[in-house]
């Protein structure tokens, strides 16, 4: 922080608050802020033992507020001139020009704390304090010779105008007073009153001493109040000269006769008025003393000497009085010289008026008159004296003392003459002598007087001429000496300038401005004080440069502000005011002169044209239309429901918040570059400058990276092609960037791009090589007949055995990674422990080949699946126990021949081990563990396929058994629905017919059922399989099979349970089973007797829910599977196959899981019963009815069938 001034404390001050400083008289202070006229913020200067200012003082107690009237600006050490131009490098330094006069306040040998002197030599300097290099400033005291010729000419002119004026200039610092014998001050100071003023005396070290200054009685005295120094008393006539400095400091120059060790006295008055009063009093007292010194005050002497002027030696123009003639014998005792008179050497002898003796009547003799005769010639020295010649007749008028007598000559003139020059005579002798010589004496006296006057004029002219010549010689000598000094000074400065300009010293020592700024900011501003209001802290605001400010006026002329122009921002000009505040004013509000000034700076026209005014009016009209159109929307919003209004209100609030965020981001901390002005200077259109400036500020671009910007970077920021060229040229011109730099930047960018391309190409070549090697191995294995099973996806390792990076975005990176090696000894111990553990009970399930689940997530190339942390089912499908056979009661009709047992399918083929080395280095250990596990046998019957609906019922029963266990379904991709047809295969490669969802046709092996009344070839009604299938999953407690197919329909009874009462002939009503199977319910006989011709017997039909031991066994088996799922052997097997912690729904599911989605079988029961017609037929064949039925009901019931009956 730069200092405003260096001041010195005038008085002691005790701080009244924590933010104030304690002051002691003569303490030096660095003034930091002086905006407030009554309180200044200052830092106390500390000195070390050698008197050098301490530069590293970081004590906060040295910064605070001080009263402005308790300090004054300190006196400089010297005045010096700058040898070279110097430009300030930091805020604490000061710029200076060559030959500029500087006031030096401090010096540490390397840096000088200075202030510019300015044009007024009596002022305290201009501007602020600052440091300059000591080797850039002349060490010698500056010689100011600029005003010497003017003073010389003025003195010459004044001398020519007043060459005859010999009065002494008592108001200024004139020539010293001639040495004369002074009378007593008591006599000189009569009538001179004493006046006193409170002042401070300054010693040789510029220390102040309070006291009282008094002037009067032809004396000047000073009484100190701070010490016991005796009162100094000086004659007013010993003050040779006096001057006033800075309006308050009185400088007195004393003559050697003062008898003091100091030749000068300095007093500091409290105000300018008091200083002026002191000057006037000195001049008045000095004039009174000089007048009193010239008064005829006789001084008695014991031995009178010849009369002589006391100051005859001071000037050659005053002649010495003639020596007295020898005393006559008769009057030897009276022949004494006159006493010494105290006269002023600067006053000329009085001019006597020519008095005509004829005009003066002769004094009539009186008897009481005493006559005398002049014994010597006497020249009058004062106005009251009388000039007499030897032997002149005189009349003695008074004898007031023994030294001087008052006489009258024959011409009637009166005056005083020395008593020793006059001899008294008697009256008769005087009368006789005077009667004859009166006329001759009068004529001789007149001639003598005229001669004396002429002689005096000639002598005065001679003296004046000699004085002028002497002064001219003195002036020439002074001019010559001054020229020699200036020549020597010029030669010395030229010699210094001829040397190379030294480098500025390093900033090794400098006042700790950081501590000063911090301490200054911590100063609190007290409130409610009786003392003056404290200045506000303005340290955080930077002030504009005074050289760049100007007066700005608005269009009305009512407001004016002095500020510095910073640039444009969104159609407004930015101004930096003198108090540090930055404001923005619209251009159209500025006066025409300011707009013209801005146009000269920017080179663009800123006054709006007619087209722009019309466009602005059109925009205003458009905005008005938009506001009017938005009003119906507001009314529409008011008519919305409450929920819609709330949503609309939230939407508006979110828009407002977003607008505020943008405004806060736009009004954030400003960077040191005004990008708007930058683009404007580059020639970019004003409308685009704002957008480009916001882009640069958003991307944190500053001046340090401007030289490295290339067209591609500017294009990515959003600049247009033409603006890119303009900005590039402007950057090259402003920062002197040559073409080689641009080419080097482009070459670097292209080199980086080429390097990246080469690295990508190398990686791609390696990946292609690896892929080609794998394809070659697969092709070779295929030619050899080997089946190579792809390596299962690993959770923690990749295909090459390296650990995967299982970290994903959003999860913390693990601090340490586990080793990729597996301890074989630990696995062997685990294997033995598993071998000793009891083998779990074997489970019977439908045998199906193990199908590796297909990866549906991200590829292994990504290193980690997106769903790696979701639960997953085990890789091997748990075996399902065989469903227990539910025994059904024998029907009353002859039973059909039993179906032969289903053929045992061949065992599943074991995958041939690949000849290629295992992809996972731990696969061998996991295979050993899998080999120790007991294999579970599974048997799956192969359902047959009926080629046509006309096959025998026996074949149908062998080909399809609805109660038999079903094979597993094919795996379902994650992105497909569950109701797609699942077609798994057995080891033989043949398809197993599985049905899920709603089918458009009936299952293989099931006969079409005809409904209605058949008129021709009507056969007995076939049994219908009805019941509810568990499709919703909520009835899984009843078992995976849901409701068993139940047989309903007509039996062979006689009509409605009565034999022989039906018009139809046929068998009897067969026993029908209703109720819950396995719950102890007895079968109920329902239905009709056969009522048509050629009707065959109806087989036993089963109805009801099957919830016997089969469902209980399924529940127990599910619980046992859930317990064994988390055993160590199963977990190791899952980790080996890559199915650990995967979604159970993504793996192949159990065959019973989707039974709810299978269509319920309807058709023939074993026994060879033919299809039956129900209802009334109208000549249509059974096949036509079957087709109609299939067209009318293309889908099965959601519950897998419905109710089958004859009604």
UniProtKB/Swiss-Prot annotation:
Its main location: membrane. Residues 891-908 have a biased composition (Pro residues). Residues 151-169 have a biased composition (Acidic residues). Residues 465-496, 531-540, 619-629, 641-665, 773-786 have a biased composition (Basic and acidic residues). Keywords: Actin-binding, Cell membrane, Cytoplasm, Cytoskeleton, Endocytosis, Endosome, Membrane, Repeat, SH3 domain. GO terms for biological process: actin cortical patch assembly; endocytosis; regulation of actin filament polymerization. Residues 2-76, 77-142, 367-427 form the SH3 domain. GO terms for molecular function: actin binding; identical protein binding; protein-macromolecule adaptor activity; ubiquitin binding. InterPro entries: DUF1720 (IPR013182), PH_SLA1 (IPR056996), SAM/pointed_sf (IPR013761), SH3-like_dom_sf (IPR036028), SH3_domain (IPR001452), SHD1 (IPR007131), Sla1_SH3_1 (IPR035800), Sla1_SH3_3 (IPR035821). Residues 143-185, 325-367, 448-553, 609-667, 736-757, 773-919, 936-979, 1175-1207 are annotated as: Disordered. One of its GO terms (cellular component) is plasma membrane. The keyword Thylakoid does not apply. It holds the Pfam family SH3_9. It is a peripheral membrane protein. Residues 542-551 have a biased composition (Polar residues). Belongs to the SLA1 family. Component of the PAN1 actin cytoskeleton-regulatory complex required for the internalization of endosomes during actin-coupled endocytosis. The complex links the site of endocytosis to the cell membrane-associated actin cytoskeleton. Mediates uptake of external molecules and vacuolar degradation of plasma membrane proteins. Plays a role in the proper organization of the cell membrane-associated actin cytoskeleton and promotes its destabilization. This is Actin cytoskeleton-regulatory complex protein SLA1. It comes from Mycosarcoma maydis (Corn smut fungus).
């Amino acid at each position: 922080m730069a200092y405003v001034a260096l001041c010195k404390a005038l008085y002691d001050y005790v701080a009244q608050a924590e933010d104030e400083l304690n002051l002691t008289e003569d303490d030096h202070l660095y003034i930091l802020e002086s905006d407030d006229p009554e309180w200044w913020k200052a830092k106390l200067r500390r000195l070390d033992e050698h008197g050098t200012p301490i530069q590293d003082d970081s004590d906060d107690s040295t910064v605070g507020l001080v009263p402005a009237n308790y300090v004054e600006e300190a006196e400089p050490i010297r005045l010096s001139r700058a040898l070279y131009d110097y430009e300030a490098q930091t805020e604490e330094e000061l710029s200076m020009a060559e030959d500029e006069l500087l006031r030096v306040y401090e010096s540490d040998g390397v840096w000088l704390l200075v202030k510019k002197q300015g044009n007024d030599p009596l002022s305290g300097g201009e501007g602020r304090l600052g440091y300059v290099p000591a080797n850039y400033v002349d060490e010698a005291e500056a010689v100011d010779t600029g005003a010497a010729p003017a003073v010389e000419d003025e003195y010459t002119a004044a001398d020519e105008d007043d060459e005859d004026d010999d009065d002494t200039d008592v108001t200024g610092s004139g020539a010293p007073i001639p040495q004369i014998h002074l009378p007593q001050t008591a006599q000189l100071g009569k009538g001179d009153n004493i006046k006193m003023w409170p002042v401070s005396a300054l010693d040789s070290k510029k220390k102040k001493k309070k006291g009282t200054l008094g002037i009067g009685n032809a004396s000047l005295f000073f009484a100190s109040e701070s010490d016991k120094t005796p009162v100094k008393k000086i004659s007013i006539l010993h003050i040779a000269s006096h001057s006033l400095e800075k309006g308050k400091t009185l400088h007195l120059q004393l003559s050697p006769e003062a008898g003091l060790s100091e030749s000068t006295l300095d007093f500091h008055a409290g105000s300018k008025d008091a200083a002026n009063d002191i000057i006037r009093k000195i001049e008045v007292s000095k004039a009174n003393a000089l007048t009193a010194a010239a008064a005829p005050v006789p001084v008695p002497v014991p031995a009178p000497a010849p009369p002589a002027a006391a100051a005859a030696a001071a000037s050659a123009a005053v002649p010495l009085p003639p020596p007295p003639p020898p005393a006559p014998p008769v009057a030897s005792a009276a022949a004494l010289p006159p006493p010494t008179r105290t006269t002023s050497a600067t006053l000329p002898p009085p001019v006597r008026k020519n008095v005509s003796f004829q005009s003066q009547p002769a004094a009539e003799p009186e008897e009481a008159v005493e006559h005398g005769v002049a014994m010597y010639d006497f020249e009058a020295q004062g106005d009251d004296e009388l000039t007499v010649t030897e032997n002149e007749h005189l009349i003695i008028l008074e004898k007031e003392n023994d030294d001087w007598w008052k006489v009258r000559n024959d011409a009637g003139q009166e005056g005083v003459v020395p008593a020793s020059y006059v001899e008294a005579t008697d009256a008769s002798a005087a009368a006789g002598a005077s009667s004859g010589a009166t006329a001759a004496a009068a004529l001789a006296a007149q001639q003598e007087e005229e001669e004396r006057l002429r002689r005096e004029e000639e002598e005065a002219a001679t003296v004046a001429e000699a004085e002028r010549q002497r002064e001219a010689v003195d002036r020439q000598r002074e001019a010559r000496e001054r020229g020699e000094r200036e020549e020597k000074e010029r030669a010395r400065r030229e010699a210094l300038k001829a040397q190379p300009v030294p480098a500025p010293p390093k900033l090794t020592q400098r006042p700790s401005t950081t501590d000063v700024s911090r301490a200054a900011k911590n100063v609190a501003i007290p409130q409610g004080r009786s003392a003056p209001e404290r200045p506000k802290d303005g340290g955080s605001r930077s002030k504009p440069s005074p050289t760049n400010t100007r007066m700005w006026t608005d269009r009305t002329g009512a407001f004016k502000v002095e500020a510095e122009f910073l640039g444009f921002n969104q159609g407004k000009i930015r101004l930096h005011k003198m108090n540090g505040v930055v404001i923005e004013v619209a251009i159209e509000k500025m006066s025409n002169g300011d707009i013209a000034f801005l146009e000269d700076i920017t080179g663009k026209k800123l006054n709006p044209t007619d087209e722009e005014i019309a466009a602005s009016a059109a925009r205003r009209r458009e905005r008005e239309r938009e506001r009017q159109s938005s009003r119906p929307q507001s009314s529409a919003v008011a008519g919305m429901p409450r929920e819609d209004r709330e949503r609309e209100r939230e939407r508006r609030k979110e828009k407002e918040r977003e607008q505020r965020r943008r405004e806060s981001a736009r009004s954030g901390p400003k960077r040191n570059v005004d990008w708007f002005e930058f683009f404007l200077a580059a020639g970019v259109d004003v409308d685009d400058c704002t957008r480009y400036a916001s882009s640069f500020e958003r991307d944190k671009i500053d001046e340090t990276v401007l030289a490295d910007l290339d067209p591609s970077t500017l294009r990515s920021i959003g600049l247009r092609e033409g603006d890119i060229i303009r900005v590039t040229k402007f950057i090259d011109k402003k920062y002197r960037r040559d073409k080689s730099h641009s080419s080097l930047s482009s070459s670097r960018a292209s080199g980086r791009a080429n390097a990246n391309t080469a690295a990508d190409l190398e990686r791609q070549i390696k990946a292609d090589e690896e892929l080609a090697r794998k394809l070659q191995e697969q092709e070779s294995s295929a030619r050899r007949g080997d089946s190579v099973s792809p390596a299962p996806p690993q959770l923690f390792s990749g295909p090459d055995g390296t650990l995967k990076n299982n970290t994903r975005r959003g999860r913390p990176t693990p601090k340490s990674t586990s080793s990729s090696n597996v301890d074989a000894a630990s696995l062997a111990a685990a294997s033995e422990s598993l071998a000793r553990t009891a083998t779990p009970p074997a489970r019977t399930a439908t045998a199906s080949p193990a199908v590796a689940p297909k990866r549906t997530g991200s590829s292994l190339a990504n290193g980690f699946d997106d769903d790696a942390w979701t639960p997953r089912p085990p890789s091997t499908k748990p075996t399902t126990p065989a469903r227990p056979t539910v025994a059904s009661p024998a029907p009353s009709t002859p039973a059909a021949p039993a179906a032969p047992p289903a053929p045992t399918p061949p065992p599943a083929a074991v995958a041939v081990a690949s000849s290629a080395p295992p992809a996972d280095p731990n696969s061998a250990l996991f295979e050993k563990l899998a080999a120790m596990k007991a294999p579970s046998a599974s048997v799956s019957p192969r359902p047959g396929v009926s080629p046509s609906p006309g096959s025998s019922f026996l074949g149908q029963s062998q080909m399809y058994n609805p109660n038999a266990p079903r094979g597993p379904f094919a795996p379902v991709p994650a992105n497909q629905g569950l109701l797609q047809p699942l077609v798994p295969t057995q080891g033989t490669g043949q398809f197993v017919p599985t049905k899920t969802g709603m089918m458009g046709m009936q299952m293989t092996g099931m006969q079409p059922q005809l409904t209605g009344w058949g008129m021709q070839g009507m056969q007995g009604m076939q049994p219908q399989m009805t019941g509810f299938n568990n499709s919703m999953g909520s009835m899984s407690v009843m078992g995976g099979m849901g409701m068993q197919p139940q047989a309903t329909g007509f039996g062979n009874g006689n009509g409605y349970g009565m034999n022989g009462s039906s018009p139809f002939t046929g068998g009897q009503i067969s026993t029908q089973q209703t109720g819950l199977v396995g719950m102890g319910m007895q079968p109920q006989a329902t239905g009709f007797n056969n009522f048509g011709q050629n009707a065959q017997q109806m087989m036993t039909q089963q109805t009801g829910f099957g919830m016997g031991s089969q469902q209980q066994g399924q529940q127990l088996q599910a619980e046992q599977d859930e317990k064994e799922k988390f055993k160590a052997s199963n977990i190791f097997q899952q980790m080996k196959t890559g199915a650990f912690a995967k979604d159970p729904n993504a793996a192949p599911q159990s065959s019973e899981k989707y039974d709810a989605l299978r269509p319920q079988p309807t058709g023939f029961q074993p026994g060879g019963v033919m299809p039956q017609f129900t209802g009334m037929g109208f000549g249509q064949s059974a096949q036509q009815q079957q087709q109609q039925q299939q067209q009318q009901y293309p889908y099965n019931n959601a519950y897998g069938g419905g109710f089958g009956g004859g009604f």
